């Protein structure tokens, strides 16, 4: 959750974590299938703009997310169900070179969710503020999906 430097792609980084009692097979579709995000998150709309191949939500898919009229687009760049999802933001954030990876790890009591990303700010001097915003947002996503998955696992 600290800045790594001042230049080049990925100069600012973050990492958040959450745990759920649900197995990875329950958590994976909630994160991997774009349309399911609005079930468990604060997003008002979620879905695919373009399907990936061979899996519609996999590599090459462009996902669109909206929260109260503000949207973002991201491309899936890594796909290893039910353990790893990587994506790059195409639009919607004031950043360049944004890359994030969500990793699901089986643990004795369920699943550990790790969300890590890196970016460069488009506007000089805004990196630390964006980093703080992204840490809070991604922690909320991780906590919300963990809590929702806990309920599905009951």
Regions found by a protein language model. Name each.
Residues 38-39, 66-112, 118-120, 148-151:
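Hydrophobic-ligand binding "helix-grip"
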Residues 14-20, 102, 115-117:
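A structural signal for short, well-ordered beta-strand segments
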Residues 15, 35-71, 82-84:
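Short beta-edge strand/loop motif at the mouth of beta-sheet-based domains
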Residues 1-51:
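Hydrophobic ligand-binding cavity/cleft-lining segments
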Residues 2-5, 59-63, 89-90:
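Short, P/G- and charge-enriched loop/turn segments at secondary-structure junctions
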Residues 112, 118-154:
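A conserved amphipathic terminal alpha-helix motif
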Residues 7-8, 51-59, 78-80, 105-108:
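Short, ordered beta-strand-loop transition motifs
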